[in-house]
From Swiss-Prot:
Pfam families: 7tm_1. Keywords: Behavior, Cell membrane, Cell projection, Disulfide bond, G-protein coupled receptor, Glycoprotein, Membrane, Receptor, Transducer, Transmembrane, Transmembrane helix. Residues 1-38, 99-107, 175-193, 371-378 are extracellular. This is 5-hydroxytryptamine receptor 1A. A motif (NPxxY motif) lies at residues 396-400. Detected in hypothalamus, mesencephalon, amygdala, medulla, thalamus, septum and hippocampus. Heterodimer; heterodimerizes with GPER1. Interacts with YIF1B. Interacts with GPR39 and GALR1. The gene is Htr1a. One of its GO terms (biological process) is regulation of vasoconstriction.
């Protein structure tokens, strides 16, 4: 969003300078050719990467069937929104930055500001929708499976655009101050105090609060699941120890001492149906695992504990088998929890990046109209803050590509043009 101008011709009055600051502002005649070249290269690279990254996300979801689910529909819609920012907003913002002057007329300025506010607000609200979707999926996983439909995703996406329209349209209908159009060389958003509060809270501060609450509850739910899993493992381990201790003590060897070969450990065979000797075979929780249990030796003879029956009555569960089953179950739970924590971590990084990019901008956007000429903001710092917000549209696809293996594989296929060969 563009709430401040970068330069206003040869005028240097306080009301016309960037951020309403005092002192002289670099005029169009003072802008050097080297500044224009360097700025054009930097901003051109940013815009190109933003377009390419978001286009790849959209193409990946459209071409890769494994990515076509409700959660990724929200991500795809976010990419479309960021693509609109990159194509419709950033080129005009870059031209404004390079020339240090608005040269496209007042009508185009109004359209530029409306598109800027609409697309940037929708992009921010998409992050809210993604956080809300993850919150429902983690806190109500069973019921939300049936509720997580494309229709619900479409409703969330439509809501983000509706709120964006409600925030972007009012200045075009007159909710602005007369000073907003006083300088033909400047193009800034309305500095009306009421609209400033309405737009900044609607586009950023309320969504920020909502995301903080949602992610706080997501982390709390994830932590509860982890602790619950640990308690189950500990309880199962205690039960296994109790069941093992109830087994009859081992018989002594002929010399009255436990034999050196007593209570041998299990021999694990990964191939189902492999012949086993001197032991009892039982298929555990892992369908690909067979346990061979040699229990006790007396002289040259061997005695084997009976395997637990289907009903579990009058049988003893071998400790090694129970430990193996427990390890298998625990490993599966750890894998599931690791995937869940990775998802939460990824979305947390997205939210953190969003805050880093947009918080400085919205602090300035909220404070500036109220402090008038008492605020002092260097023009260069203002431009950096402005483009830091725009860069969020570049960083979103980078984060998804880095953390999501499915997206990585789809991007590789796009680069190698494997989809073209189908």
């Amino acid at each position: 969003m563009d709430v401040f101008s970068f330069g206003q011709g040869n005028n240097t009055t306080a009301s016309q300078e960037p951020f309403g600051t005092g002192g002289n502002v670099t005029s169009i005649s003072d802008v050097t050719f080297s500044y224009q070249v360097i700025t054009s290269l930097l901003l051109g690279t940013l815009i190109f990467c933003a377009v390419l990254g978001n286009a790849c996300v959209v193409a990946a979801i459209a071409l890769e069937r494994s990515l076509q689910n409700v959660a990724n529909y929200l991500i795809g819609s976010l990419a479309v929104t960021d693509l609109m920012v990159s194509v419709l907003v950033l080129p005009m913002a870059a031209l404004y930055q390079v020339l240090n002057k608005w040269t496209l007329g007042q009508v185009t300025c109004d359209l530029f500001i409306a598109l800027d506010v609409l697309c940037c607000t929708s992009s921010i609200l998409h992050l809210c929708a993604i956080a809300l979707d993850r919150y429902w999926a983690i806190t109500d996983p069973i019921d939300y499976v049936n509720k997580r439909t494309p229709r619900r995703a479409a409703a969330l996406i439509s809501l983000t655009w509706l709120i964006g329209f409600l925030i972007s349209i009012p200045p075009m209908l007159g909710w602005r101050t007369p000073e907003d159009r006083s300088d033909p060389d400047a193009c800034t958003i309305s500095k009306d105090h009421g609209y400033t509060i309405y737009s900044t809270f609607g586009a950023f501060y309320i969504p920020l609060l909502l995301m903080l609450v949602l992610y706080g509850r997501i982390f709390r739910a994830a932590r509860f699941r982890i602790r619950k899993t640990v308690r189950k493992v500990e309880k199962k381990g205690a039960g296994t120890s109790l069941g093992t201790s109830s087994a009859p003590p081992p018989k002594k060897s002929l010399n009255g001492q436990p034999g050196s070969g007593d209570w041998r450990r299990c021999a694990e065979n990964r191939a189902v149906g492999t012949p086993c000797t001197n032991g009892a075979v039982r298929q555990g929780d892992d369908e690909a695992t067979l346990e061979v249990i040699e229990v006790h030796r007396v002289g040259n003879s061997k005695e084997h504990l009976p395997l637990p029956s289907e009903s579990g009555s009058n049988s003893y569960a071998p400790a090694c088998l129970e430990r193996k089953n427990e390890r298998n179950a625990e490993a599966k739970r750890k894998m599931a929890l690791a995937r869940e924590r990775k998802t939460v971590k990824t979305l947390g990084i997205i939210m953190g990046t969003f805050i880093l990019c947009w918080l400085p901008f919205f602090i300035v956007a909220l404070v500036l109209p109220f402090c008038e000429s008492s605020c002092h903001m260097p023009a260069l710092l203002g431009a950096i803050i402005n483009w830091l917000g725009y860069s969020n549209s570049l960083l979103n696809p980078v984060i998804y590509a880095y953390f999501n293996k499915d997206f990585q594989n789809a991007f590789k296929k796009i680069i190698k043009c494997k989809f073209c060969r189908r």
